[in-house]
Every structure is written in C-alpha cells, then in structure tokens.
From Swiss-Prot:
Gene from which this protein is expressed: hisK
Species of the source: Bacillus subtilis (strain 168)
A Pfam family hit: PHP
Origin: domain of life: Bacteria
UniProt record, GO biological process: L-histidine biosynthetic process
Keyword Kinase (UniProt): no
Protein name: Histidinol-phosphatase
Keywords from the named record: Amino-acid biosynthesis, Histidine biosynthesis, Hydrolase
Secretion signal span: none
Broad enzyme group: hydrolase
Catalytic activity, reaction form: L-histidinol phosphate + H2O = L-histidinol + phosphate
GO molecular function: histidinol-phosphatase activity
Pathway in which the depicted protein is active: Amino-acid biosynthesis; L-histidine biosynthesis; L-histidine from 5-phospho-alpha-D-ribose 1-diphosphate: step 8/9
UniProt cross-references to Gene3D superfamilies, sorted A to Z: Metal-dependent hydrolases
EC code(s) of this entry: 3.1.3.15
Amino acid sequence: MQKRDGHIHTPFCPHGSNDTLRQYAEEALKKGFESITFTEHAPLPPSFTDPTPLKDSAMAQASLERYIHEISGLKKEYRGQLSIRTGLEVDYIAEFEDEITLFLDTYGPYLDDSILSVHFLRTDSSYLCLDYDEHTFKELISACGSIEAVYEQYYRSIYSSIVASLGVYKPKRVGHITLVQKFIKLFPYSMSEHIRGLVSLCLNAIEENGMELDFNTSGLRKTYAGGIYIEDWMLNEAKQKKIPLVFGSDAHQAGDVGYAYEAFLERC
C-alpha cells in the first residue's frame, strides 16, 4: 500500500498557516510518504455568503489559478521523489448545487483528486458553520431545536452531497464523516438508532456511487473532538462494503502532515 496523505491544506487557506507548499512536501518526504494531495478549501459559491465572522472559510477565487499553477510547478520539482496531486476540498451547500457544478466544470480538468465535505448547515434564517467554534455550534443546536436535530441535518446533508448530480468532475471522496462531533466533549451525544440509520444510508450511497472515505485524523488534534473523524462501527461497516479509505491528516501546517498515520495502519 502506497504511503499517502490525501488531505493537506496550504498557505492559500485563510485560516491556516503561512507554511509554504515546499515545506509541506519536505515534511511528507521526511516522514516517508510517497504521495500527497493538496486539498485547499475551494472558493465558495459566488452567491453564498460565508457566515463566519472573518469570512475566512475558503480560498479566494482570485487565488485559485495561482494555487493550481504553483502546485503544477511543485509536481515537476519533486518528480521521482514524491507524487503530488492537485486537489480541492469542495463544500457541498444545499441549494447551491448549480453553482458548485459550474465551478467543477470549469476547474475540474485541472484537478487530480478532490474531497466533498459539509461544513455549513442551513437554519430557518441563515447558514451556520458547524465546526467554526463551540459558540456557533451551540447556536446551531438552538436553531435546530436539539443536538439530535443537528446530527440529523448534518447526515442528511452528507447524504445529499453523495447523491447530488455535480457533473463529471464531482469529488470522489467524502470528507470527515463525523465532523459534527468536533465539540462532542462540550455537547455530549450518543447517536440514536435513527442517526445511525442515516449514517448507514450514507455509507450505502458511498458504496453505490463508487466513492471513497476520508480517514481524517485531525480530530485527534482538536481540544473537544475526542478522536478520529470516523467511529469504529462506521469504519467496520465501510470495510465490509469495501469502501476505499484514504488517510488524511487535514494538515493546516506543515508539521501536521502524516499526523497519526499509525492509527490508519492499525485500523484499516
């Protein structure tokens, strides 16, 4: 099995570090990785307003061509040493499918490997970023009516992302399937049979659509998350279905490339 980190951010991330692309590549080589994918947060749909206070959830549209160009140069520089893939972490946002598809139709030809994630959930009056901070998550619980309702909306959104028609360049990998648990130590919740059923529907849809799962270790670095962003029972179900699992550090600084790769080897 190729040693690969399939979820890495870059200096183009407005809420990340200024570590250079080369620093990420060098860290990967130092840790014995053979392949990496840069998956910066794709620009959000033009008509969508980023609900975070600093509006820093994603790369600016104006930076996208330079991002692709710089990775292309790095690929040549590291040819024969490290396989580097150009990718994006694309947000699935309900009701913005047409804009997402247009974006993918435009930039998909330049991408090698991408992730489809859910960060934003719709409330009655707006969208909220579920992983921004604990205060926003508390607001989300209030807006949805209960913590179970937040989980239900999250997994319904994940399911919608999997079955959505987003064109031929739709990302093939589902990102951090339990990101909704980022603040679980502050807002404890054990999944009900209903929610577990929704997760199973998502896994069935991933299998049916020939998609992959992000084995995301960034939750181990989060104060309130409590672990890797996939529960053991989900992992077992995914393996039974032969869903490909791709290790992802979700590094936002070079030092986190390959973080807890041993957990991936042990469990996958």
